[in-house]
Amino acid sequence: MARTLGSHAKHTKPKISAIALNLFSEQGFAAVSMRQIAAKAGLQAGALYNYFPDKQTILSELLINHMENLLETWSAQVLPDEPNELLKFFVDFHIDYHLNRPEEVFIAYMELRNLSDDNFRKIEKLRGKYELILSKILTDGVKEDLFSCKDIKITSLAIIGMLKELNTWYKKDGRVSVLEVKYIYKEIVLKAVS
């Protein structure tokens, strides 16, 4: 029997993905076997290959889905027109999106090294689209004499680098609230471009 009695194929692939995400974020990609993923999903090891040909495919799909969802979620936002407000909105958006997805964010940054060259390029392309969003905000702000950036690309990467590190240290029950963190981060970002 390839599938646990009562399971449904249409629910199995998302279940496998969720289990793999959890295992990769807890143990690291290299430490997790296909057999472990199958066992947690209630599948025989061989049945897992009906959904994913290998562990690399699971990882790449998780990372691609994370980046595509990030871009789609941004695209669905009602954005302010003014660059100052849009930059603050970007900071808030990034913080909210990433703090609500700790496992996805962890593997998105920590497991890039385990991607094949082709899959790495796919993720880099999607990350580049996200970086372009911030670069455009900064470029528009510079054009309107609201921001001063010697190098838009470096400034964008520095801001995103600072924002992405939030997931490594922020604790919901820590000494500062999310609102306080957002306020401080927006202040830092605005000072960096003034």
Predicted regions and their residues:
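C-terminal peripheral helix-coil segments that are non-catalytic and often amphipathic
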Residues: 1, 93-96, 100, 132-140, ...
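N-terminal intrinsically disordered/low-complexity leader segments
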Residues: 1-11
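Helix-turn-helix
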Residues: 4, 15, 19, 23-57, ...
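Amphipathic, non-transmembrane alpha-helical scaffold segments
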Residues: 9, 59, 63, 67, ...
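Amphipathic alpha-helical linker/stalk segments
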Residues: 62-88
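Amphipathic alpha-helical packing segments from all-alpha helical-bundle domains
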Residues: 68-71, 118-143, 153-157
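Helical hydrophobic small-molecule/effector-binding pocket
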Residues: 88-109, 156, 160
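Amphipathic alpha-helical segments used for helix-helix packing
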Residues: 99-118, 168, 172
